[in-house]
Design a protein with these regions (language model features):
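Catalytic domains that recognize anionic headgroups
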Residues: 1-117
Length: 117
């Protein structure tokens, strides 16, 4: 497809589809049922990893701080999905529907039920 890796002006589906995985042991699930239930509740929702990782890790670790935003944590029942952005080759965030994705990449996103836009 003649694309270079990260920060292509117009990315391909393969640059946008980054798995977000959380594994919990049986002991963790029993010890932290609220976080476990929240993760289960949010498991099919789209995640903007760059925005959610920090806040999700705080929630999963039971860390309380003024910096934690529950609406960004997949381990919170207050998690809210947000539009997905792509950081372009000029280091600027652009909405997925504003970057000129190719039709085959849009179809890949839709087939995998990834939020677009």
């Amino acid at each position: 497809r003649k694309l270079f890796l990260h920060a292509s002006p117009v990315p391909s589906y393969y640059q946008l589809h980054v798995p977000f995985l959380i594994w919990m042991s049986e002991a963790y699930r029993k010890g932290y049922p609220v976080q476990y239930e929240a993760v289960c509740m949010n498991r099919e929702k789209p995640v903007a990893g760059n925005a959610s990782v920090f806040h999700s890790m705080l929630s999963l670790g039971g860390i309380q701080t003024d910096y934690k935003e529950d609406s960004l944590s997949v381990a919170s029942k207050r998690y809210v999905t947000r539009p997905r952005y792509y950081l372009n080759d000029h280091n600027l965030p652009k909405l997925l529907d504003k970057i000129g994705l190719k039709e085959k990449d849009i179809k890949q996103l839709e087939q995998r039920k990834m939020m677009y836009p």
